[in-house]
């Protein structure tokens, strides 16, 4: 069996990346074509600069945060493993982890932001909560790029983006990945997030709070 590839080649450079948790016989890379598509789009459309305020959302193992670390991005995720992998991969590439601000799903990223990169999560409830909370951080000039693998992108993703953020423009599929550009529409009325869902456990005094992407 050939060893799994651990070096990602991107317009921003060459980066060593590994997944978490570590497995003796790892079968999967720490990035996918959707990560590569986002980084290619950034290289083509965004002029590098220290003043660009970047927010990365749902970065599985830190591929995006590592490649864009020179821009001091915020990395917003509900996964502790993602945070660990991001820190490990920053260190593995000689990058100070303090340069990337990790934000968990119960925290609100700082705004405003100029560039948002979103990897579509498996659970659309999480995406809905994130988009609603993201909206106040956007300006009319914010560039929002959304990506995922074609097989994991239901049509409801487009409907949700257009309802909560603005008009979408979909690029051609590339390496079985899809990229969506979103133009923020600040005139849209965005509802309050329905999360966390709260209910009282039958027969007890316990009030249960169920956050997006948490199952009970």
Roles of regions detected by a PLM:
Residues 23-32, 37-45, 173-216:
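SAM-dependent Rossmann-like transferase core, predominantly class I methyltransferases
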Residues 140-152:
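Conserved beta-strand signature within the Rossmann-like core of class I S-adenosyl-L-methionine
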Residues 86-87:
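Conserved SAM-binding loop
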Residues 28, 43-64, 216:
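Conserved class I S-adenosyl-L-methionine
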Residues 72-78:
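Conserved SAM-binding motif I beta-strand of class I
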Residues 102-120:
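A short acidic, Gly/Pro-enriched loop at the edge of an enzyme's catalytic core
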Residues 64-67, 83:
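Conserved SAM-dependent methyltransferase scaffold
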Residues 127-143:
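A short glycine-rich, Lys/Arg-flanked "PGG" loop and its adjoining helix->strand segment in the class I
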